[in-house]
From Swiss-Prot:
SMART domains: Lactamase_B (SM00849). Thiolesterase that catalyzes the hydrolysis of S-D-lactoyl-glutathione to form glutathione and D-lactic acid. SUPFAM superfamilies: Metallo-hydrolase/oxidoreductase. This is Hydroxyacylglutathione hydrolase. Coiled coil: none annotated. It is an enzyme of class 3 (hydrolase). Belongs to the metallo-beta-lactamase superfamily. Glyoxalase II family. GO terms for biological process: methylglyoxal catabolic process to D-lactate via S-lactoyl-glutathione. Zn(2+) 1 binds at H55, H57, H116, D133. Monomer. Binds 2 Zn(2+) ions per subunit. PANTHER family: HYDROXYACYLGLUTATHIONE HYDROLASE, HYDROXYACYLGLUTATHIONE HYDROLASE GLOB.
Amino acid sequence: MHTVTPIPAFNDNYIWLIHAKDSGGHYVVDPGDAKAVLDYLEQHQIVLDGILITHHHSDHTGGIAELQASHDHKLTVYGPDNENIKGINHPISGQTESVKPEKLDSDAAVFHLPGHTLGHIAYLIDDHLFCGDTLFSAGCGRLFEGTPAQMHHSLQTLAQLDETTLVYPAHEYTQANLAFALTVENDNEALIAHAAKVKQLRDQNLPSLPSSIGLEKQINPFLRPEQASIKQNLSCHFAQDVTDDGTSFTLLRQWKDNFL
């Protein structure tokens, strides 16, 4: 059994702290800001055991060196082996399907999710999915390196997980994503209801996360590019006939990239 706590960092990052109830271990996911982590550890008298990295962007990796230095270089650091990330001492290859982090209570299933970056991975520990910048609540990551087809496939992989799976993205982007999703689907009742709930949370400066796979399948247009109503709205917006799922996903991402 594991519990998960958000450590806010920068303007909108979450560094997720995983606590293993039985083994007593603690890992952080994507610690871009060492100070935020160290302050939290000190405040709560927690000893850190390791780090899980999803991809190479500095707001996810920038704290590795300082965290290692503050722990006598004894931290276990997992991450993709093909993203040139300094500080990883347990590299994960493209063939790896799971890892067993010491002092966690369960193995971590590994998902290879090219799109946001080519080597992006996610970790599933029990029913907790740490998906970095691939899947956001009501959205998905920008395509800095991969293709729309790769991201579409990566998201469809995650959509196959159990609907009760909890989703822990690395950013508090939910309200902005919901604004776009409501533009695409202004009659989606689940989306309208969730937007109201998220507004209440954010008005109190509370996280909108975690989400769940089941919820995302209802509110996230990037998980449903095949839906006829989404294709129809895309056809109207882009003044072209949108029939296949791949084109639908590509145009959704293009629309979001330019959405204000």
